[in-house]
Amino acid sequence: MAITKEDVLEFISNLSVLELSELVKEFEEKFGVSAAPVMVAGGAVAAGGAAAAEEKTEFNIVLVDSGDKKINVIKVVRALTGLGLKEAKDAVEGTPSVLKEGVSKDEAEAAKKELEEAGAKVELK
């Protein structure tokens, strides 16, 4: 039986952020491409400025620094992301790292507060 696009999309949607990042790197190496965003023409930037004035609804949680209490930060990262111990440790030690993408403002702020209480420095982008 052949694998369909839906099967591939279902598989990808079940990957963790760390696994997805590794998959993107493998695609870049295998096919010689880059996942970097394409430069936008000057006219489109002016139009995008109006959209940026609106309040942002989706945020990425970026761990900037794990601080002195790495074990506490790893525990919080595991609880927030569902990552295994090794993946969470790699994310904490490999800062800066994106822990979650496209989350609501409330979820992002709650995660930031929890991580900062554990001793980490976090940015919401």
UniProtKB/Swiss-Prot annotation:
Instruction: Provide the alphabetized UniProt keywords.
Output: Ribonucleoprotein, Ribosomal protein
State the disulfide connectivity: none
Reading the lineage from the top rank, the first entry is Bacteria
Q: Name one GO biological process term.
A: translation
Q: What GO CC annotations are associated with the protein?
A: cytosolic large ribosomal subunit
Q: Does the keyword Ribonucleoprotein apply?
A: yes
- MF term (GO), any: mRNA binding
CDD domains per record: Ribosomal_L7_L12
Q: Which Pfam families match?
A: Ribosomal_L12, Ribosomal_L12_N
Q: Ribonucleoprotein: is it a keyword of this entry?
A: yes
Function (record text) = Forms part of the ribosomal stalk which helps the ribosome interact with GTP-bound translation factors. Is thus essential for accurate translation.
The entry describes its oligomerization and partners as: Homodimer. Part of the ribosomal stalk of the 50S ribosomal subunit. Forms a multimeric L10(L12)X complex, where L10 forms an elongated spine to which 2 to 4 L12 dimers bind in a sequential fashion. Binds GTP-bound translation factors.
Family named by the database record? Belongs to the bacterial ribosomal protein bL12 family.
Q: What is this protein called?
A: Large ribosomal subunit protein bL12
Q: Which organism is it from?
A: Campylobacter concisus (strain 13826)
The gene name on file is rplL
